[in-house]
Amino acid sequence: MKANLCYRAGAVLAVMLLTAVFAAAADNGDGIFVLTSTNSASNNDVVVFKLNTAGTPTLSLVNMLPTGGAGGASGNAGAVQFGDDFGAVANFGSNSVSQLVRQGGSISVAGTIKLAPGCVKPASVALAGNQLFVVGANCAESHKFPSGNVDGPVVALTDPSAAQIAVGQSWAAVTMTSGSVLQLLLNGEGTLNGTTAKVTLPSAANNTPLGAAFWGDILGFNPAHSPDSFALVNKNRNVFPVVGPQPPYPTNAPCWLAKGPGSLWYSGNSPGQAISIFFSDGQGGTFYKSVSLPGTPTDITVSRDRQWLAVIYTAADGSGGRVAVFAIDAYGDLSPVATSSPIGVAAFSGVAFSQ
């Protein structure tokens, strides 16, 4: 009987927490949007979904916006980002970034930002303050945003395998699928200052670095094909590896990373078809559990208010690219909220919230 009462109390608490999340979201009259891209090698489109939390939650297609550029990237994350009113999407095949703008309850493509001369194939973008950061096949660069002008030195890259760029307080990081992480220092105004250093990775955490995210000035990243498939790096380039879900690659490979509330991190585990959850402090952490998905995740994000998680995945039933949204409760646990219907796109690239 006591166990029954505990179960009922827990269920009531879970419902109350989920209801509170929905109520907080409903306070935003303009709504919550989830953006991704088709990544088409001929004509890239931004795909805009709206999350409706009234009654039975839904994730409905609102618009498909031609970027005016071409996609075609693979093995990357962070192709789409969104801040307060402006966002960006990488056009890998046309050496450009499209600027997005939100006005009330609508999102549109506002223009094209060209890469610095000689820089090609942008794979990942990041937004921090009034800066846009871009990494491609041969350059990492920062631009004033939303104006788009190159701001600060362009960093030449000799390794064309960049997967993602992420930005902290005093430094940015680029993960390289070839097996390295590059530190890019920032100046006092938050732009790249041209100084770079390679992070020395331990042998148990150096195979195929992919997803990356910052917690203040601490980098978290996924060396996806390593036994230690999650790791932290501080500004002094000290590395703190964390054992991932077992068995390791090829059964499990946390690939794509998002920072959650508190000490939580969420990772898209592609072969495991799951979201793998980690806890950490600043010098280590632990794998907690995995939440199953009906397909292979290809990128993941958490909303700025830390109440929602969105993951893009390629459905196991062959229906193509899908977006799933989860509510994050007060303890960091995930509750499924809504999933998009198939729209005829084989796989999505990049995912971001606009609130």
What are these regions (language model features)?
Residues 10-20:
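Bacterial N-terminal signal peptides
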Residues 27, 68-83, 115-131, 156-171, ...:
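Beta-rich, blade/repeat-based domains predominating
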Residues 43-47, 96-98, 141, 180-183, ...:
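Structural motif
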Residues 49-57, 100-106, 144-150, 183-192, ...:
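Short loop/turn segments immediately following beta-strands, especially the blade-tip
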Residues 60-71, 108-116, 151-157, 193-203, ...:
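A short beta-strand motif characteristic of beta-propeller blades
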Residues 133-189, 195-204:
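Aromatic- and glycine-enriched pocket-lining scaffold segments that form the walls
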Residues 321-355:
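Blade-level signature of beta-propeller repeat domains, shared across WD40, Kelch, NHL, RCC1
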